[in-house]
């Protein structure tokens, strides 16, 4: 049985929104929302074709941010507030890619959760 392709609904969004970047040691997730928190576009390093240890590189972070930003730009978003979470290597590259895709960054806030001496961290890697 042939599958029917659905046409994606194009909804114009407000020109201002937020970008949530989660840069972990293994992957990069970029979610762009409007000011109410409704998701406009999202992307991840795995969605853009990166596999394994290539997902946590600054280049993967740049490509991921560009793809999410272009989709949001096409829907009418122009100004963003950036929230960064996590210790990953592609944090700065992601912000530069957002600016390169045409979005104006109005503020940058680091919301990485820091424990007040909570759980014991994982042991150090010996490479």
From Swiss-Prot:
Organism of provenance: Chlorobium phaeobacteroides (strain BS1)
Family: Belongs to the universal ribosomal protein uS11 family.
GO terms, biological process: translation
Binding partners and assembly: Part of the 30S ribosomal subunit. Interacts with proteins S7 and S18. Binds to IF-3.
Protein name (database record): Small ribosomal subunit protein uS11
Name of the encoding gene: rpsK
GO MF entries: rRNA binding; structural constituent of ribosome
Function description: Located on the platform of the 30S subunit, it bridges several disparate RNA helices of the 16S rRNA. Forms part of the Shine-Dalgarno cleft in the 70S ribosome.
Plastid found in the keyword field: no
PANTHER family in alphabetical order: 40S RIBOSOMAL PROTEIN S14/30S RIBOSOMAL PROTEIN S11
Keywords of this entry: Ribonucleoprotein, Ribosomal protein, RNA-binding, rRNA-binding
GO cellular component: ribonucleoprotein complex; ribosome
Cited SUPFAM superfamilies: Translational machinery components
Pfam families hit by this protein: Ribosomal_S11
Superkingdom, taxonomy of origin: Bacteria
């Amino acid at each position: 049985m042939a599958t029917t392709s659905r046409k994606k609904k194009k909804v114009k969004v407000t020109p201002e929104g937020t970008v949530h970047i989660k840069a972990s040691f293994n992957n990069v997730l970029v979610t762009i929302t409007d000011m109410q928190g409704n998701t406009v576009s999202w992307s991840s390093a795995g969605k853009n074709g990166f596999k394994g240890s290539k997902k946590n590189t600054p280049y993967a972070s740049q490509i991921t941010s560009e793809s999410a930003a272009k989709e949001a730009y096409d829907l009418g978003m122009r100004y963003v507030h950036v929230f960064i979470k996590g210790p990953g290597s592609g944090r700065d590259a992601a912000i530069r890619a957002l600016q390169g895709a045409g979005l104006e960054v109005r503020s940058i806030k680091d919301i990485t959760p820091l424990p007040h001496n909570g759980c014991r961290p994982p042991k150090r890697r010996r490479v």
